[in-house]
Regions:
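Acidic, Ser/Thr-rich, low-complexity intrinsically disordered regions in fungal proteins
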Residues: 1-87, 98-109
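Basic, alpha-helical interaction scaffolds
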Residues: 90-93
């Protein structure tokens, strides 16, 4: 629980909770930032539910976009592989975690 809290604070310190789409960053770095933030988001909700603790990341406190459902490359010549990606499942997990967060807020508010 404490380690996750430190990870979330570090993510917030480097601005992972803020939209970076207009920043001058390579597409792969932007996508990595989104994925790392949402990994913290999902873990925050799962650990909060398991431990009965309040959420650290509130939905109103971030504006970063959802990750995309495919691999992102900096080189336009790299082809996106055919078939489903693991990121489809990750996005569904994020959406379920959002619902879990609302349930936890209702339970513990």
């Amino acid at each position: 629980w404490h380690t996750l809290g430190k990870a979330i604070r570090m993510a917030q310190d480097i601005g992972l909770h803020r939209s970076c789409s207009n920043w001058d960053l390579p597409p792969s770095e932007i996508e990595t930032r989104h994925r790392v933030f949402y990994a913290c988001y999902v873990l925050d909700r799962l650990m909060g539910a398991r431990a009965g603790k309040p959420l650290t990341i509130l939905d109103r406190d971030f504006d970063t976009e959802l990750p995309v459902a495919h691999e992102v490359y900096d080189d336009a010549n790299d082809a996106t592989p055919a078939g489903p990606s693991i990121y489809h499942s990750f996005i569904k997990l994020i959406k379920l975690s959002e619902i879990l967060g609302r349930v936890l807020k209702a339970l513990y508010a």
